[in-house]
């Protein structure tokens, strides 16, 4: 299958994989060998967000980075509503179709609810968790509610996202602390997946869902105690907006009792852009803690997991 848009190969030098999903296609990256790490993005990002993490770790473990339907290079099936519930179903389908075993879930932004929905329903298949600037409960703090009402509201929020591509054009650069990293290539990579107003709707549904998906988020929250004994690395960008204050990080520390935490004073919301090196280190660490140590050339051996790849 052909890419729907071009991306700088020096930035994103990966082979494309495609998983049929209903009458759509899920695009994903599948790099490396060894213990399986699933990298989940948020809004309005895609697997490109993890490019520098994948480059650093591809010789040490197997990294799977999907694009949700309607994001990145994935094609949404007919009737797809772009809700987090549907994205969670798509991620579950991908994990099951690829037969991924004993996975590490790496989650940030909406990747938290999407990925942890899988984790709370399949805790025995989750080896570890790396968690960055996210939540998995109904929004109660005022900044998040106001953000949802503005960015996911009608008509202003809808106009901003569908007519101005506001999330990709403005919020992503604003959520990166190191401004020298906000290059023309990066801007292009995040705006190109949304060339028309109709294709930008997914970026509006996500902020709208902060309020609209309350019951679904509450169901995840009720099951979070199932994750208490899973080793976790919490990586928190302290320069993030008021929606992800330190108090939210501390809440995660109380839930994920087997956590190790690193608070980053030089990272904002998109930790993967600001500090991909620390994301990679956190993945290595959780693998070490779970006896699935990342492969180091000529020093560490591992037992390959039972899984398969699909290419079209």
Cite the ranges covered by each PLM segment:
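Conserved hydrolase catalytic core segment
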Residues: 101-141
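Active-site loop/oxyanion-hole signature of alpha/beta-hydrolase fold enzymes
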Residues: 22, 65-107, 281
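Catalytic active-site module of serine/aspartate enzymes centered on a nucleophile-bearing elbow/loop
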Residues: 257-312
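A short loop-to-beta-strand scaffold at the N-terminal edge of the catalytic core in hydrolase folds
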Residues: 21-31
